[in-house]
């Protein structure tokens, strides 16, 4: 028997409790600009910490390999119904434990080792799981990569030529570091012309898509994968949306194909997040995310920094640091010392190594969640520029850190 009053983390494991408290302070006192990070609601976190973590539920609602699943069936069905409504999908699988496993599930269902896939080059803003040679997708399949044109937009004409030349079985759309809107309809036409499936990985853009401020790939793609965190502001996990005709294949690929028992506490948290995302408040939030990103990018340009693609049409932007003679690694460290959290990121055709890079990636979802508006976004842009102009000046770092402290105190994450 467990005594809730005594079985607290603080009592059971003081070392872990201390680390959690330190991380809480960091999140409250630092400005979070990593585009793939966000803050979940207390309701989402409560679902993840619920008794549902105790329940094994191999299978799917109404067809389980374990008894006692009548209530987790309700939870999973709610998650399925809500995410279908959110994106207008015919079918959904909410069991993938991550976005990478969602992608792997589609590959496992529809491809065989040695098949040809075509995806956006990691060097141009794609994702590891879209065919990078260091990932299983690049090891198991023959990969053809498309990228950006001279204007740093997706080179759709080159992608079309590659598709006709190589006849891929599956085309992957989506990116992890691309700021503009993706023409999913055009990519769908390319896929159809060569007899390929189209899979869209919308992990970065899912929250924006749910709110209608970014193009929805669901009407155009055979499969749409996503994480449930990032801009969607849910728990860490994955989802696959699909045409109804592929539901059985995808479900079998996830279980028993690549996963065993689903994480029911996480699926409950996904359901809560989907309900939050269906609200009018969430749409307003995403509109602010896009506006804050636009203001942040414009401010950086005014301060002499170059934004890859020249602008952002979403929540994310890549900053080219070469004109400032500073690497992404050094910029990440300097901004971190000022309590502004970013991640170093390669720019298109980056001459630096992946652990060094010539750029940083910035995103607006987390700062918007804590209440920042255009005025704060402009201030943050100027603070970033101040640090990048004097990355080794202790007085500048101290001044910016003090301004960050004042700003984060006015806009707490959790009251």
From Swiss-Prot:
The record marks 229 as: Plays an important role in substrate specificity. It comes from the Bacteria. This is Serine hydroxymethyltransferase 1. GO terms for molecular function: glycine hydroxymethyltransferase activity; pyridoxal phosphate binding. It catalyses: (6R)-5,10-methylene-5,6,7,8-tetrahydrofolate + glycine + H2O = (6S)-5,6,7,8-tetrahydrofolate + L-serine. Its main location: cytoplasm. The keyword Repeat does not apply. Its EC number is 2.1.2.1. GO terms for cellular component: cytosol. Keywords: Amino-acid biosynthesis, Cytoplasm, One-carbon metabolism, Pyridoxal phosphate, Transferase. SUPFAM superfamilies: PLP-dependent transferases (SSF53383). It is an enzyme of class 2 (transferase).
């Amino acid at each position: 028997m467990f005594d809730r009053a005594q079985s607290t983390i603080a009592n059971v494991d003081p070392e872990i409790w201390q680390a959690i408290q330190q991380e809480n302070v960091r999140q409250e006192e630092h400005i979070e600009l990593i585009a793939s990070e966000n803050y979940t609601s207390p309701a989402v976190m409560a679902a993840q910490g619920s008794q549902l973590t105790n329940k094994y539920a191999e299978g799917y609602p109404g067809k389980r390999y374990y008894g006692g699943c009548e209530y987790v069936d309700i939870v999973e069905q709610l998650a399925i119904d809500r995410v279908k409504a959110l994106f207008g999908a015919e079918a959904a699988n909410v069991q993938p434990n991550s976005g990478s496993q969602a992608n792997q599930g589609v590959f496992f269902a529809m491809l065989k080792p040695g098949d040809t896939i075509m995806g956006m080059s990691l060097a141009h803003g794609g994702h590891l799981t879209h065919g990078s040679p260091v990932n299983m997708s690049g090891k198991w399949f023959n990969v053809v990569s498309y990228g950006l044109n001279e204007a740093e937009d997706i080179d759709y004409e080159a992608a079309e030529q590659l598709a006709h030349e190589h006849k891929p079985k599956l085309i992957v759309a989506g990116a992890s570091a691309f700021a503009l809107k993706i023409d999913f309809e055009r990519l769908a036409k390319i896929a159809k012309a060569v007899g390929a499936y189209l899979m869209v990985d919308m992990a970065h853009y899912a929250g924006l898509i749910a709110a209608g401020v970014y193009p929805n790939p669901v009407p155009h793609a055979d499969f749409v994968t996503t994480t449930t965190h990032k801009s969607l502001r849910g728990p860490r996990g994955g989802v696959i949306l699909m045409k109804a005709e592929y539901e059985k294949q995808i479900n079998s690929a996830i279980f028993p194909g690549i996963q065993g028992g689903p994480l029911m506490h996480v699926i409950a948290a996904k359901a809560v997040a989907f309900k939050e995302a269906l609200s009018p408040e969430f749409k307003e939030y995403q509109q602010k995310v896009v506006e804050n990103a636009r203001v942040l990018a414009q401010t950086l340009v005014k301060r002499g920094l170059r934004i890859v693609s020249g602008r952002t049409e979403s929540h994310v932007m890549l900053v080219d640091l070469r004109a400032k003679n500073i690497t992404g690694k050094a910029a990440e460290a300097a901004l971190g010392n000022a309590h502004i959290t970013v991640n170093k990121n390669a720019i298109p055709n980056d001459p630096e190594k992946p652990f060094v890079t010539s750029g940083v990636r910035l995103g607006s979802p987390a700062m918007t969640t804590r209440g920042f508006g255009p005025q704060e976004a402009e201030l943050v842009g100027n603070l970033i520029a101040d640090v990048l102009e004097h990355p080794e000046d202790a007085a500048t770092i101290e001044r910016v850190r003090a301004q960050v402290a004042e700003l984060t105190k006015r806009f707490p994450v959790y009251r």
